[in-house]
A protein has these predicted regions:
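HhH-family (HhH-GPD) DNA N-glycosylase catalytic core used in base-excision repair
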Residues: 1-138
Length: 138
């Protein structure tokens, strides 16, 4: 592939160890979750499933929550319909917008307004100035 960086195949993901994922920048806990999910799931089937089915399968896996499912939906499955719910910057944004500590459900509601573009909206909103302000409601 002439030096191009291509996504790993399902087989390559299943064969990778958590330590290899840590070397790529994942936190150890997320690396363990990814390695376990890669071994438990039929990744090719996941790619071919409707996004709602794929997300439901992901969320049934141990240690996979809405943030991880959003990352997989966006970058692994190429779907823009599911945002990165619960992301720290989105939590800060919601906290500053609402004037109270935000919940994961608040980030879900924020992204729901963007419909089929919630995934792209989540990436954009992570860079909103209020997402980086730490002087928010306690």
């Amino acid at each position: 592939h002439a030096g191009m960086l291509l996504p790993l195949s399902g087989e390559e993901l299943r064969a990778a160890s958590p330590a290899e994922f840590v070397r790529c920048g994942l936190a150890p806990r997320r690396a363990s979750a990814l390695a376990l999910a890669a071994r438990n799931l039929d990744l090719d089937r996941l790619r071919d499933d409707p996004i709602a089915t794929a997300l439901a399968r992901l969320l049934r896996e141990p240690m996979i929550g809405p943030w991880s499912a959003g990352v997989v939906a966006l970058w692994g499955l190429g779907s823009y319909t599911h945002g990165i719910v619960g992301d720290l910057n989105l939590m800060r944004l919601c906290t500053n917008l609402l004037g109270r500590p935000a919940t994961v459900a608040d980030t879900r509601r924020l992204l729901a307004d963007y419909g089929e573009w919630a995934g792209l909206a989540s990436l954009h909103l992570m860079h909103h100035p209020l997402a980086h302000r730490r002087n928010h409601a306690a």
